[in-house]
Amino acid sequence: MILLSDNDLVVKLAQCDLLDEALSSLEAKRSECFVLSTIKHSLRLENPDRSIERYVGSPQAFERINDFLEHCSVLPEAPILDLIDHLVDIPEIDVGEQALFLHAKSNHDNNLDYFMLTGDKRALRAICTYDQFQEFEFLRTKVVCLESCMMDMIDYAGFDYINEKVSTARPQIAEEKYDKVLRTAFGKERTQEHCLDCLRHYSNDIRWLLSY
């Protein structure tokens, strides 16, 4: 199994101390998770105070991300494929996401088993409404977003366990860095039914792509 992950989802899972649970729910190990080569610079990990304040939201997340990066793999330079012509046509897709999509297409073409993990629903929505969306057919059922990842983990570890993890993490995270979906779906008074309804609602418009 190959997991291709963007920075955003790594941060959100680290904030909640759910990195390993996410991998386990996808039957993968840390070494099978590939991150962008720019992640350390993008999150300013060389400057702990700035990284925590501007990017990762808590000291706990900062420590977990650094530990995670010691064991996961780094993506090489993205292959140049015809898909790039479509990617540059979609302004909502940034350079990092472009690289993930190119690696995903390469894995598909080489019959490699993979999932793409991303917290960038803006890019995913843009693909779903792209006038040549058939060019992204290879992604169908291969994308894991925050919402589908949470549903996978609830199936794997149970709602009470995941809800406790998210609820415990919330006070540790700077409010402006805490995801609004997690704020809405999880909490001490939340039920599993409420949580799943929220997660489905927030991911419904990209359902075509999702693994869950």
Residue positions per predicted region:
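Active-site-proximal, substrate-binding regions of enzyme catalytic domains
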Residues: 1-114, 121-212
